Swiss-Prot record:
Its main location: secreted. Has antimicrobial activity. GO terms for cellular component: extracellular region. Residues 30-41 have a biased composition (Acidic residues). Residues 1-22 form the signal peptide. It comes from the Eukaryota. Residues 23-43, 74-75 form a propeptide. Residues 25-44 are annotated as: Disordered. Belongs to the frog skin active peptide (FSAP) family. Cruzioseptin subfamily. Expressed by the skin glands. This is Cruzioseptin-11.
Length: 75
């Protein structure tokens, strides 16, 4: 009976350790995926900021060109 209890405790302990290790690896993988998603969204935001600034600069340049043409036409 004592051998059976020891064997049962050993099996339960090893199973618990194995489960704990699997859960830890799963959490690490999820954290890596979240971090990769964050990095990708930061890259997208950076790209969109650049496009926005280029668009503003192009719009200002076009507005200045039109304004100059109108001013030259009035003279």
């Amino acid at each position: 009976m004592v051998k059976l209890k020891k064997s049962l405790f050993l099996v339960l302990f090893l199973g618990l350790v194995s489960l704990s290790i699997c859960e830890e690896e799963k959490r690490e993988e999820e954290n890596e995926e979240v971090q990769e998603d964050d990095d990708q969204s930061e890259e997208k935001r950076g790209f969109l900021d650049i496009v926005k600034h280029v668009g503003k600069a192009a719009g200002k340049a076009a507005l200045n060109a039109v304004t100059e043409m109108v001013n030259q036409g009035e003279q």
